[in-house]
Swiss-Prot record:
Catalytic activity: L-tyrosine + H(+) = tyramine + CO2; L-aspartate + H(+) = beta-alanine + CO2
Keywords of the record: Decarboxylase, Lyase, Pyridoxal phosphate
In-chain residues carrying the UniProt-annotated modification N6-(pyridoxal phosphate)lysine: K234
EC main group: lyase
Gene Ontology biological process: carboxylic acid metabolic process; coenzyme A biosynthetic process; methanofuran biosynthetic process
Species for this entry: Methanobrevibacter smithii (strain ATCC 35061 / DSM 861 / OCM 144 / PS)
GO MF annotations in UniProt: aspartate 1-decarboxylase activity; pyridoxal phosphate binding; tyrosine decarboxylase activity
Protein name as it appears in the record: Probable L-tyrosine/L-aspartate decarboxylase
Family, as annotated: Belongs to the group II decarboxylase family. MfnA subfamily.
Cofactor annotation: pyridoxal 5'-phosphate
Gene name in the database record: mfnA
Lineage: Archaea, Methanobacteriati, Methanobacteriota, Methanomada group, Methanobacteria
EC numbers for this chain: 4.1.1.11, 4.1.1.25
Function: Catalyzes the decarboxylation of L-tyrosine to produce tyramine for methanofuran biosynthesis. Can also catalyze the decarboxylation of L-aspartate to produce beta-alanine for coenzyme A (CoA) biosynthesis.
Record InterPro entries: GrpII_AminoAcid_Decarb, MfnA, PyrdxlP-dep_de-COase, PyrdxlP-dep_Trfase, PyrdxlP-dep_Trfase_major, PyrdxlP-dep_Trfase_small, Pyridoxal-P_BS
SUPFAM superfamilies for the chain: PLP-dependent transferases (SSF53383)
Length: 385
């Protein structure tokens, strides 16, 4: 820190120079991110609520009301009229909260002290963080030939210490939806906590269904589902950080509650103490501003771009790994390693990522990627081919 103050002009000049090194979503060349540029109206509202603290809701009753309304609105999308939950920093925190709820609930009501969680091999790395933080043993269920969790593998791995089963609605690498209906039945029959990580698909699948896309049930319409992660800062167009965790029952929050004697509420269940209300307010605003019609149009456009890109790849001669269920396309060159292809694309200014299972170039078709961007990308891929 400098001894003497520096002018705003000089500080902003320095920050602008530093920020120029960042990649911008608006360039359309960030291809591997599940996040995108927030809607301008959501950004405006976010700034309006910067000083609100949901960690002390008695002081910010209006903002707490907004959070409750957002959870209720998301709950309606996920087939539950009275959900419980919070707007948090993202899918990682939401998944950690879900695993903490599962562990604490099993410890209180089943006496399980050394818990195990069954997750697919395709699960997000946040579950490894959760297991490490809460001393849970991870049991990785195998994937089937379609890269979805193998139901038989889940059955085989259930034990007396199983505190949770996890399924994914929109896998990180391929955007696939696990057989959640079958897993819900298994979890329900065995009285095991069942969590659905719909961080990616939760703000897309409900709207795609409304415009004619077919998806099996994945939400609270299934009696075995105990909690769902959903991220407004992905397809919801809310600013980062805005994640959501919804629970079927209040008791899942209660088993995580700790005393907070010097605040305006007696207990607190979230991991983070001080929580900005800005994310809740921005999510509230953009959900009202876009409405069902706006999100249906957005989801439809993303899938149109997905199909356009997939068909373009196949015309050139690239191998598409799986038929896209959501707006992710994974592909390979028939005669080139994925990492080598990624390097060539990076040299051309495209920011791609490489999936690990299977190894393939992974492109996430988010809102900042236009059809023209995809045409330019396909042209470069043609030259590489």
């Amino acid at each position: 820190m400098e001894d003497k103050p520096i002018s705003k002009k000089d500080i902003l000049k320095e920050l602008n120079e530093i920020q120029s090194k960042d990649h911008k979503y608006s360039d359309g060349r960030i291809l591997g991110s599940m996040c995108t540029e927030a809607h301008p109206f959501a950004k405006e509202v976010y700034c309006k609520f910067l000083d609100s603290n949901l960690g002390d809701p008695g002081l910010f009753k209006g903002t707490k009301y907004i959070e409750n309304e957002v959870i209720k609105s998301i709950g309606e999308l996920l087939s539950i009229s009275e959900p419980y939950g919070n707007i948090v920093t993202g899918g990682t925190e939401a998944n950690i909260m879900a695993m903490r709820a599962a562990r604490n609930h099993a410890r209180k009501y089943k006496g399980i002290k050394e818990g195990e969680i069954i997750i697919p091999d395709s699960a997000h790395f946040s579950f490894k963080k959760a297991a490490d933080m809460m001393n849970l043993k991870i049991i990785e269920a195998k994937l089937d030939e379609n890269y979805k969790i193998d139901v038989d593998s889940v059955k085989e791995n259930i034990s007396d210490n199983t505190v949770a089963i996890v399924a994914i609605a929109g896998t990180t690498e391929l955007g696939l939806v696990d057989p959640i209906e079958e897993l819900s039945e298994i979890a329900y029959e065995n009285n095991i906590y069942f969590h659905v990580d719909a961080a990616f698909g939760g703000f897309s699948i409900p709207f795609l269904r409304k415009i004619g896309y077919e998806f099996p049930p994945f939400d609270f319409s299934l009696p075995g589902v105990c909690s769902i992660t959903v991220d407004p800062h992905k397809m919801g167009l809310a600013p980062i950080p805005a994640g959501g965790i919804l629970f079927r029952k209040k008791e899942y929050l209660e088993v995580m509650a700790v005393d907070s004697p010097y605040l305006t509420v007696k207990t607190q269940s979230t991991i983070v103490g001080t929580r900005s209300g800005a994310a809740s307010a921005a999510t509230y605003a953009i959900m009202k501003y876009l409405g069902n019609e706006g999100y249906e149009k957005l989801a439809g456009n993303l899938m149109d771009n997905t199909h356009y890109f997939k068909e373009g790849l196949e015309k050139i001669g690239y191998d598409v790994v799986v038929e896209p269920e959501l707006n992710i396309v994974a592909f390979n060159h028939p005669d080139m390693e994925a990492h080598d292809l990624a390097d060539k694309l990076e040299d051309l200014g495209w920011r791609v990522s490489v999936a690990k299972c299977p190894i393939a170039i992974r492109v996430v078709l988010m809102n900042h990627i236009t059809k023209q961007h995809l045409t330019d990308l396909l042209d470069d891929l043609t030259e590489i081919y």
